[in-house]
Amino acid sequence: MSALLSPDQLEADLRAIGARLYHDQHPFHALLHHGKLDRGQVQAWALNRFEYQRCIPLKDAAILARMEDPALRRIWRQRIVDHDGNSTTDGGIARWLHLTDALGLDRTLVESGRALLPGTRFAVQAYLQFVSEKSLLEAIASSLTELFAPNIIGQRVAGMLKHYDFVSSDALAYFEHRLTEAPRDSDFALDYVKQHADTVEKQALVKAALHFKCSVLWAQLDALHVAYVTPGIVWPDAFVPDRDASRVAA
């Protein structure tokens, strides 16, 4: 039987999971960040990624609804504001739509979800189901992929600005905000997990939750790679560059 880890040992194990399985290791991101994709492939990435962005506040609302401690809810609800925005400030969803606009995608099509890859839809729905059905501790632990986000964001912004003349720093404003939001959120979630994963069984569950979340992110990139890189098998109703870049959803 495994021994109970100290909080710092648990953190080390969680960071090791991210180092091995976070989606910065996926070949599709290497192509994206090194300028190896064409405009249509970047459009496909942004369109499909919007489904994940759209569901982030839904995920956080599901977690929030299960929190009985008002102090905990006050902290967690900031995540929803970050993505939904408020009466005076745009949130992450609006900023992602600003990116898809800048890439030449029709906003109605993006928001409709009609052109998504099935793999994208299934991965995101699996994540929503996970945080709704698993324990609160597991749901919070699944958010710990944000520990690794600042590194990939830096690579993405620098690489896309260097290699793609159709991308501007203004279009990538979403990522600038995440450089401060993600560390704040992950620091809180990590402290919560280290404090509450106080048995061998709970520690195994939080590691499994992070492993699962990494697989959700990886699966989305698998779907993109198969459809838009190689072997190029696109779901018949999914986005097709050139044909659909300005298509308005029926």
From Swiss-Prot:
| Biological process terms in GO annotation | pyrroloquinoline quinone biosynthetic process; sulfur compound metabolic process
* Record key words, sorted: Oxidoreductase, PQQ biosynthesis
Q: Which reactions is this enzyme annotated as catalysing?
A: 6-(2-amino-2-carboxyethyl)-7,8-dioxo-1,2,3,4,7,8-hexahydroquinoline-2,4-dicarboxylate + 3 O2 = pyrroloquinoline quinone + 2 H2O2 + 2 H2O + H(+)
* InterPro entries noted in UniProt: Haem_Oase-like_multi-hlx, PqqC, PqqC-like, Thiaminase-2/PQQC
Tell me one GO molecular function of this protein: pyrroloquinoline-quinone synthase activity
| Entry-linked Pfam families | TENA_THI-4
> Does the keyword field hold Oxidoreductase?
yes
Quick one: which pathway?
Answer: Cofactor biosynthesis; pyrroloquinoline quinone biosynthesis
Q: Which residues form a coiled coil?
A: none
Q: Which family does it belong to?
A: Belongs to the PqqC family.
Primary role = Ring cyclization and eight-electron oxidation of 3a-(2-amino-2-carboxyethyl)-4,5-dioxo-4,5,6,7,8,9-hexahydroquinoline-7,9-dicarboxylic-acid to PQQ.
What protein name applies here? Pyrroloquinoline-quinone synthase
List the source organism: Xanthomonas oryzae pv. oryzae (strain PXO99A)
